[in-house]
Amino acid sequence: MSIEDKVKRILAERLEVDPSEIRPDAEFISDLGADSLDIVELLMSLEDEFDIEISDDEAEQIMTVKDAVEFITKRL
């Protein structure tokens, strides 16, 4: 499973959205309906899944699916 597929799976589970709605340019808040608590839980899930750490400053830069995939790719 690719990084993007794993990110989409986590998003679909955490935000209870249809995976087909999750596009690379989808913004977590405006397109996928996430709130601030959802974002925190999502980032924690990504940290656990990929065994990485995301600082608060870095988290502020991760706004879309593509942002998350690119960030994780750089860390692995």
Curated annotation (Swiss-Prot):
Pathway in which this enzyme or protein is active: Lipid metabolism; fatty acid biosynthesis
One GO cellular component term noted in the UniProt record for this chain: cytoplasm
Compartment(s) where it occurs, according to its Swiss-Prot or TrEMBL record: Cytoplasm
Gene3D superfamilies attached to this UniProt entry: ACP-like (1.10.1200.10)
Residues modified as O-(pantetheine 4'-phosphoryl)serine: S36
SUPFAM superfamilies named among the record's database cross-references: ACP-like
Pfam families reported in the protein's UniProt record: PP-binding (PF00550)
UniProt keyword Cytoplasm present: yes
Signal peptide per UniProt: none
Domain called Carrier: residue spans: 1-76
Chief location category: cytoplasm
Posttranslational mods: 4'-phosphopantetheine is transferred from CoA to a specific serine of apo-ACP by AcpS. This modification is essential for activity because fatty acids are bound in thioester linkage to the sulfhydryl of the prosthetic group.
GO molecular function: acyl binding; acyl carrier activity
InterPro entries reported for this sequence: ACP, ACP-like_sf, PP-bd_ACP, Ppantetheine_attach_site
Origin: domain of life: Bacteria
Keyword tags: Cytoplasm, Fatty acid biosynthesis, Fatty acid metabolism, Lipid biosynthesis, Lipid metabolism, Phosphopantetheine, Phosphoprotein
Function of the molecule: Carrier of the growing fatty acid chain in fatty acid biosynthesis.
Family, per entry: Belongs to the acyl carrier protein (ACP) family.
This protein's name: Acyl carrier protein
